[in-house]
């Protein structure tokens, strides 16, 4: 007897199926396909198992498919059993039935081009009632009747509904669906319904009934724009009392509490109002209240404001001049304000022009002026106007003083002596004529260019070209919010921590993008130092469309936290800066960190394994990475700091191959793929979390130790994803069952033992970071230094057409890899030796052995050679 088993598609979460076991009948059925067992209808209880069987006769190794409601059953266990050579039985097992499993089932098999179908069976799943309509939350006025609805279905039927008001039964029994009529409530009340059938009962969600009330008083009332007759007002509405606000009233008075106040009613939203026809230069006060269906709110506080005044409305009268031996005395009548809003007068403004082009403007206190700086041999034209703090009034009629007159006369300049206006008129005419000629010339050019193309269209009397109005743009530079910590809306405590590390935006220049994610990005930048030199840094910033103050505060708290750290294996803060933005938008906060040339540790490990030019990382290097991280975490734990997000992606690799613990919060925004949202909570890196963190949201230094164990596993696997093939939602059940990450290939037993200790279910049984550091340093000390002859970083390529000694791929002479053509700063590089067409592969174009370095003592070690010597322990390496 042969047995063939097939399950649902891997990777899909299996449904909980249910059913009633049917009997296997003796295999004496007629040739063909049939459903075994007698029932055409099956009824099972929710949660019970069921097995459906069908028989196939006269076929060798048939491919039996089970169908439900016309679709292939994929998420259930299916077994094919061979009774004899051409007699097979197909078995469908449903372990625990749910309502969704009810339906019409049959099996089918292909016989050449023909599909044979068995008889079908209808599966009914019975259980406690299922709610299709539950009572909803409501906000109602006091003592106003309302209704609540409830509906539940079987099978089995019938379903009976009972209503509850808090702990008291208030209605039922009634058939489903049911409506409860409530005469009204006077306080917050909860209602729920119960559904009963012969299988049991189910209770609906509670419906919370809240009382509506008049709204609260508005606040933040602000007069935003003021002119001489208008004022714009804006405010923030108070709590709406669970009812829609329909209008607000703005009350305006000359003094707070004045009886004769102007009231303006405006529909809302928006919560703004334009007050018109106000008196100029007048003190006012205003207040606002809003209303909903239950009534108005109290008024907000009185807000005083003053309208602007008016410029003088009249020109000075009786403007005349008297010649004297010492000069020219000018006199005019005082301007009396016609409107109280004009305010106090300032000095008068006197303007004069002579025929020779000389002109000037004087400010005169009083109504008399003595003009001495003028040429009596030339005609003189004068004007005067009144002014105040608001502006200038209208000019008087021109006063012409002729070179032949002994006194000036007010009126139009004389034609014989006033040639200046004539010149101005001629110039105006010339400019106008030139403009018209230019317009005609451009029009003619367009007609010449497009005339032939549009002749047929114009002949029909149709418009040749249709234009649409373009957008208009404001060429003025938009207003910018000053980039200060006060403009971000963060707490005073956080501002105090960041004030001494705030760096002006002008002090650095942003460069290329290093990485970005759902909420933020990292960019390279050049920071100008006090001595004028520049240093390369990394700048983390939120996205431009992130404007919530909570996101900004969380982002900057990471910087405030890093400010306190001082350890070679913990990322240290360089500073914080703010990037100004136009259109009144909040500045973008930026956290400035040291630039780590090799990026994050996870990306480096991944490149060593599956990059364009993979390279080997010796075991000493991998253990050294672990020692560095343990040193950094030992320092953090000694300062009572809990990281909560330790992973290879959150460790940075410096130029000298030392590892720094970093990313105290922002990393989950950059690497959002490793995070999972549980319910309404924030996204969590569940595959790095300890059991107590997953179960109780509890984070301690012991949970950081668990994450360190997962990070060690990442390092030993060169960046593989932990728990591959297991969904985030299934991690807790996987771990609570006693499962842990498997020992990676080529991982030392001592290293894996340390990992496994980190994953103890009892947090107190996990080792401390001090213990981990000491054990790892002990392991590192016992590892032998790899000789360069055994170092798999090097692959010698023979001449073109000849196989390499180690069986590696061949490259012809002169051929370059893509990395050689670059600047040599990538993960892999190739250095050519023209004499024997021999290539050396390494993480960065390294020399083949230290001996080759000695042959060229005058050449300094390049970056890649230094990396190899660091990995082999031939250069000093920073330690704890």
UniProtKB/Swiss-Prot annotation:
Q: What is this protein called?
A: Tyrosine-protein kinase receptor TYRO3
Membrane topology, Extracellular segments = 31-419
Q: Give its localization.
A: Cell membrane
InterPro entries registered for this protein in UniProt: FN3_dom, FN3_sf, Ig-like_dom, Ig-like_dom_sf, Ig-like_fold, Ig_I-set, Ig_sub, Ig_sub2
Species assigned in the record: Rattus norvegicus
Subunit structure comment from the entry? Monomer and homodimer. Interacts (via N-terminus) with extracellular ligands TULP1 and GAS6. Interacts with PIK3R1; this interaction increases PI3-kinase activity.
Tissue expression per record: Abundant in the brain and lower levels in other tissues.
- Which terms under GO biological process does the entry name? apoptotic cell clearance; cell migration; cell surface receptor protein tyrosine kinase signaling pathway; establishment of localization in cell; forebrain cell migration; lymphocyte activation; natural killer cell differentiation; negative regulation of inflammatory response
- Which family does the record claim for this protein? Belongs to the protein kinase superfamily. Tyr protein kinase family. AXL/UFO subfamily.
Which keywords annotate this record? ATP-binding, Cell adhesion, Cell membrane, Disulfide bond, Glycoprotein, Immunoglobulin domain, Kinase, Membrane, Nucleotide-binding, Phosphoprotein, Receptor, Repeat, Signal, Transferase, Transmembrane, Transmembrane helix, Tyrosine-protein kinase
* PTM section of the record: Autophosphorylated.
- Annotated residues that bind ATP are located at 514-522, 540
Record-annotated active site = 645 (proton acceptor)
> Where is this chain compositionally biased, Polar residues type?
852-864
Q: Name one GO cellular component term.
A: plasma membrane
SUPFAM superfamilies of this UniProt entry? Answer: Fibronectin type III (SSF49265), Immunoglobulin (SSF48726), Protein kinase-like (PK-like) (SSF56112)
Record topology, Cytoplasmic segments: 441-880
The Fibronectin type-III domain sits at 217-310, 315-406
Which reaction does this chain catalyze?
A: L-tyrosyl-[protein] + ATP = O-phospho-L-tyrosyl-[protein] + ADP + H(+)
Q: Which residues form the Protein kinase domain?
A: 508-785
* Keyword Nucleus set for record: no
Record-listed Phosphotyrosine modification sites = 671, 675-676, 794
* Signal sequence bounds: 1-30
For this UniProt entry, the molecular function terms from Gene Ontology, in alphabetical order, are: ATP binding; phosphatidylinositol 3-kinase binding; protein tyrosine kinase activity; transmembrane receptor protein tyrosine kinase activity; virus receptor activity
